[in-house]
Structure formats: structure tokens, C-alpha cells
Amino acid sequence: MKYLFFALCLYLYQGISEAEVPAEQIPLEAQALSGLPLVEYLQKNQRLFEVTATPVPYFKQRLMDLKYIDQNNIPDEEVEDEELEENNDDIPESYDPRIQWANCSSLFHIPDQANCGSCWAVSSAAAMSDRICIASKGAKQVLISAQDVVSCCTWCGDGCEGGWPISAFRFHADEGVVTGGDYNTKGSCRPYEIHPCGHHGNETYYGECVGMADTPRCKRRCLLGYPKSYPSDRYYKKAYQLKNSVKAIQKDIMKNGPVVATYTVYEDFAHYRSGIYKHKAGRKTGLHAVKVIGWGEEKGTPYWIVANSWHDDWGENGFFRMHRGSNDCGFEERMAAGSVQ
């Protein structure tokens, strides 16, 4: 049975507001740092986040090519949601949907995109899963298939090389997307097909990963034994665009659920372990798309609560916190989401 998913697609350009601060000027010598010298610089020159040395080649396998920063790949129609433009007095200092919607298991789920730049599809599918649950008040619990999007939406981008979250939401609207899940799992139509890289605690070891994975081919059929057909398992929505501000992002998250951010990644992010990330040093390495679920403040520093897609043993149990209000790394410029009506 199709669950009609009416979506509000956001492509958000963030201008300067009263909550924002100017971007920090990074010294040229700091911009050129890499490897251990970069880790040592971060340990000595900033206190917002903890770092640990991470191999950069493996890190790059999980990023998109910089060409996907293209801001022109957006819907033609712009629709302004007047309800989100009302006064902002009711925006709390902190908001975490995992508290309000603790029964929505997808909010706690951290996927593993492996050695594929599929973050644009993985994060979009994850946000869609959350919003279906929130709209149904916890009654509808599904994981939307990132594999269906990354393999079958040929106009969304180039699979494992990268793509646009805004196009992933349009694909949901035009064709519908089936259910999915993690690698080698059952109970859904199209689970993820690329195995996790390396060791992850007591979980099954599938092997190491060398280079970027090839994009799995599109299969318009469900796993053998799954009780639904591919067409009957699809979830649909209606897509359009919304005018943006940081407060509009917050209000939309409170009203509808998580959104997706696309931002420029520098090498210092490769070494993030915990805390509030704010770009401090290192070279530009690619693009990444992530699911933004809420926000908060720690010792006067505002942040976004973000779910990554690099397994739950990365960062803060798969999550990280991103500096809020400074548009660091362009984080607040390009956001997409869908709201259920």
C-alpha cells in the first residue's frame, strides 16, 4: 500500500542574519597542512573539537567530487511557506527529535555508505525515513532505500561519484522509492549493496575496501522472498522549494523532521573525533551530504546535531556537531528536505 508522502523540498541559501558570525580567516600556512602536521596544529590551535589521526585516502573515498556544489541543479518553482515565516519566539535554545520521537528508530540509525560517494542519496533516504515516522506519529517505521536512489536516479548525479540531494527528493516525487536497509539485511525491498569497509567491533567483517566502489546497477525488483512487488513498495511525495534562513531551517525541523545539508569538506574534518566541528586548517578535499536532526548550545557555542553515514563507531556514535550560525564550510547554504502533509 502506498504511503503518500507530500514533500516540501528546500534549497536553502543562507544570508547573514543576527545569529551569524563572520567566517574565520584561515592562515595560508594552515590551509596547506596535511597528515600528522595538521593533526598537531589542530591539537594546539583550537579547543572546539577533539581529533585523531585518520588515513586521508580512505577518507576521500566517502566524499563527493567538488563539481556537485553546483547550485543550479534545483527545482524551477519556488514556493514560500508562510507558516514558517511567523515570529521566531518559539524556537528553543536546543531541540533533539530523538527525545520527542524516541519511538522512531530511524532517528537513531546510522548507515554506512562504505567506499562510495553516495552520501547525497543515503542522507536523503534517511531524512525521508524519519519524516514518514514523525508524520505518522511513530506508526509507520520504514527505512527508505538509498540504494534505489543511488542506482536508479541517473539524472540525480553519477552514483558513487556524487549527486544532488535536491534531485534525490525530486526523484522521490517523480518515481517513488522503495524500502531498504543496511548491507546484507533482510525485510526490505532493496537494501544497500556495498559492504562496510574494515573492522567494526564485533560486527561481521566483510573485507577491506580499495579505491572508490563501482555504482551498483539499477534493479527494479525487490529481494527474492520479500512479500511486496517493487511497484507496490514505493513511497511517493510532492516536491517544491522554500525560501531559507537559519530560523526557517529550525522551524522546518521542528515541524516536519530532519533536513539534508551539503557542504565543502576540508582535511581537518577527516580527523574529527568529538566536539563541535568548525573548519580550522587543512586542504579542501571534496563535498559531503549529511542529515541535520536538531541543534543545541554548549558553553555559549551554538551547533547543529548531525547524523553522518560513516558507521556508528565514527565520531559521537555516528553523529557529530557542526558550528551553527557561521555558515561554516557553506553548511547552511544548500539544504533539502521533505515535509509530510
Curated annotation (Swiss-Prot):
Coiled coil: none annotated. Residues 1-19 form the signal peptide. Belongs to the peptidase C1 family. It holds the Pfam family Peptidase_C1. This is Cathepsin B-like cysteine proteinase 1. Glycans are attached at N103, N202. CDD domains: Peptidase_C1A_CathepsinB. Expression of the protease correlates with blood-feeding and suggests a role for the protease in blood digestion. Disulfide bonds join C104-C133, C116-C160, C152-C218, C153-C156, C189-C222, C197-C209. It comes from Ostertagia ostertagi. Keywords: Disulfide bond, Glycoprotein, Hydrolase, Protease, Signal, Thiol protease, Zymogen. The gene is CP-1. The active site is at C119, H288, N308. The keyword Signal applies. InterPro entries: Papain-like_cys_pep_sf, Pept_asp_AS, Pept_cys_AS, Pept_his_AS, Peptidase_C1A, Peptidase_C1A_C.
